[in-house]
């Protein structure tokens, strides 16, 4: 954007695009499992506010400092858990270990996780492979990848998806 601004002239057109569409959890799930780092905090917040008042489950959010915690509107049945992790700029197991340690509730959950690439991959293995949640009944996304600019992260995401499909097909 700064290069464009330096060469912009009166009448130049600027096109700005925001994030994609909202990725809301299935409201019909028996319970919910939200997880992510600070990059996913706005999306988790939107999801929590969209839930029915009777919703139950967990929202586990990793932030680097105690002062980064925020007041989030959420149903009383959703336990809000903050993981303080100063290693937020590199892959960290603190968030995913906390998620794995929580009690699995009764019924069919809807896992929703977004954040760093390696954390997303770990949560995909946990929810899909270990807990046997069908991929259509969860949302997983990486918003960033440690040490990689946006284009590199996008390439890693595509390659990961291709390898995941290949591994899935080989397992059939």
Q: What are these model-predicted stretches?
A:
Residues 1-172:
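Extended, composition-driven regions rather than compact fold-specific motifs
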């Amino acid at each position: 954007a700064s290069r464009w601004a330096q060469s912009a002239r009166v009448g130049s057109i600027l096109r700005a695009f925001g994030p994609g569409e909202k990725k809301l959890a299935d409201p019909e799930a028996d319970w919910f499992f939200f997880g992510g780092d600070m990059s996913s905090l706005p999306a988790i917040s939107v999801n929590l506010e969209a839930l029915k008042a009777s919703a139950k489950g967990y929202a586990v959010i990793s932030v680097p400092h105690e002062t980064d915690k925020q007041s989030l509107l959420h149903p009383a049945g959703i336990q809000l858990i903050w993981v303080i992790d100063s290693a937020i700029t590199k892959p960290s197991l603190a968030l995913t270990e906390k998620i794995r340690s929580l009690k699995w509730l009764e019924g069919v959950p809807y896992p929703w996780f977004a954040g760093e690439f390696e954390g997303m991959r770990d949560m995909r293995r946990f929810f899909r492979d270990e807990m046997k949640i069908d991929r259509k009944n969860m949302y997983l996304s990486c918003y960033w990848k440690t040490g990689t600019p946006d284009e590199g992260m996008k390439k890693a995401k595509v390659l990961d998806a291709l390898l995941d499909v290949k591994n899935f097909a080989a397992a059939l």
